[in-house]
Structures are given as structure tokens and as C-alpha cells.
Amino acid sequence: MKLLVVTQVIDQNDPVLGFFHQWVVALSKHYDHITVICLKEGTHSLPENVQVFSLGKENGNLSKRVYASRFLKLTWKLRTQYDRVFVHMNQEYILIAGWLWEILNKKVYMWRNHYAGNWLTDVAASTCTKVFCTSRYSYTAKYKKTVIMPVGINLDIFSPDPAVTRIPKSILFLARIAPSKHPDLLIDAIVALKQKGVTVTASMYGDALPEHVTYADSLRQKVLQLGLQDIVTFHAGIPNTQTPDVYRAHEVFINISQSGMFDKTIFEAAACGCLVLAASKDYQLLVPEELHVTQTLEESIERVLTLPAEKKQELVVTLEGISRTESLAKLSQELFQQISK
């Protein structure tokens, strides 16, 4: 079977979407040929049965109309090179080319995992054979055709490493710097912990989109104004393949994104031996109560940091076991089975 994969970025060094390179590698083991159409192409080392076509954003920003035209031309030109279509995250591609795929009798499958959605999401989903997401609270979870999937983490990369020193009472935030990720709540929690005499350090890894640069700058300014610059450090986003050692160096990973997103970083951190505190309702259905974000964030952090060493290790082992159920190998197999029906 031949598959067309449509995605934003193919670049193994991209700090946000670099993980998808690993997804394509995993999927390639199940298909005779994979054609990828991406908005932006960067560094990649994909198998011989994978061919990448870019809409050209790596050469500079053009109008949406230009990209839409290029996309339609490619989907038509390459029509004999694929039997099924898998669109990752961006419903816009289905809204642009769904009518063409229907004429060509190509079944379409959409991956969309986010709490937000609208009537355009509904229109895109209506043309799909199946819709995939990982969260029961995703906007797309409401459709009868939706299938809940594993998050898809590469356990060959994400695993504990005793050679890396884990810093006691260290907290990690790793995500885009955006209001929806709530990094400001972590800063507020650290202030409250400091006032209680609880000593912690926090590392915040991630870049901001252009529309959130002012927000990111305000966080840095807040840290300076509060005199927390020796406690809270900011770092640029790094490629997904470089994150394991960052996870391994921290004791607690914090994710306070709204339910419906179910960030895969939760399970990457768990697989690397972090104690993970997350606000996601999906996550809280899987883990012991000690790892829930309840009441205030600072109370949740203090609770997990003051657990006996034996209990911490018990929770780490539990989390590592849960992360194995969310593996990329399992995800790629389930996607293949669903798309091949």
C-alpha cells in the first residue's frame, strides 16, 4: 500500500515538530511507499521508500493562496503515487483538497488532537474515513468515527540513563512558550514555594511563536523583577532528539496544559524517569493521585517533592510502565491497521 502523508514540517531538528520525522520512519516500515507533502522542509534522513515534496516555506513566506495552489497541484500530480491520505494536525489541507481526494476515491484520515475546534473542523472530519486523537477531551473525540490512539513516543530514545545526574528538587517545563501552556503558573508556584521556604530550581525550555514573543518577554521580565533569576532559567527550544538528557537531569516534569491536548512530552519525561505532574484529565485517569495537579500547583509540587524516596521510586516505575503503552511502535502499528481497513 502507498500512503500520502501531509504535515507542516519535515525537519528532525525542529524543536516543536521534529518528532514527526520519527513517525514517518516508523510508518515507512508498514508501507511500500510513502509520499510526504510538507509546508516546510529541513534536515531529514528518511528511508528509501519515503519521498518528500515541500510547498516551499523554507525559502520564505508566501501567501496562503500560493501554498494552497501548490498543494492542489502536487496532490493531483502525485495521484498515482498514493492509495490513502493521512493528514497530520492541519484540517486546512482537507478543506483545500478533500473534494479532489473524493473524486480520486482516496480515503482520507486526519490526526487532530486539541481542545479547540469549530465548524471547519467538523467539515474536514465529515470527509474523513477515520479521525485520530489521543485525548478523550479533544474537540475531535466527539465523532463516532474517531479512534483514540497511543501518544507515540520513541522508546529507543526516551529511557532512563544512570550516567546522567538528576538534580534534586529540579523542575522542568518543556513546551512552546505560549499562554495555552501556562508557564506563568509555574513561576507563580515557585514564588509561593520560596515564601514557604521550599527550595527548588526550574528550567524552562521552549521558543515562542511570533504572536507570543511579547508574552515570553514578559515572563523573563517577571522573573527578574521577582529576583528569581538564580532559580528560574530560560533556554531556547531544542530538537526532540536532544530532549532525553534534559528530562533525565530533572526530578519533576510539569505540564499544565488544558485537557484535550495530552502533550506527548508527558510520556517522554515519564519514560526518562521523571516524576510527572500534569493537569490533564486523561493523565489523571492513568496515574496515582500523588501525580495529579490538585488545588494549587505549588501544593502539588511540594507534595511530590516531600514524598519518601521509596515512594518516589515506586511512582517512577509506574510511570515508565505507562509510557511503554504509549510507544511509537504501537502507534504506527495501530495507524497502519486503521488506515488499511
Model-derived regions, located:
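A conserved mid-protein helix/loop that constitutes part of the nucleotide-sugar donor-binding site
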Residues: 18-25, 178-198, 215
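A charged, aromatic-enriched C-terminal amphipathic alpha-helix characteristic of glycosyltransferases
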Residues: 306-341
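N-terminal subdomain of nucleotide-sugar transferases
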Residues: 1-42, 329, 333
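Short, structured helix-loop element that forms part of the nucleotide-activated donor/catalytic region
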Residues: 44, 201-229, 242
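Short alpha-helical donor nucleotide-sugar binding micro-motif in glycosyltransferases
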Residues: 237, 245-250
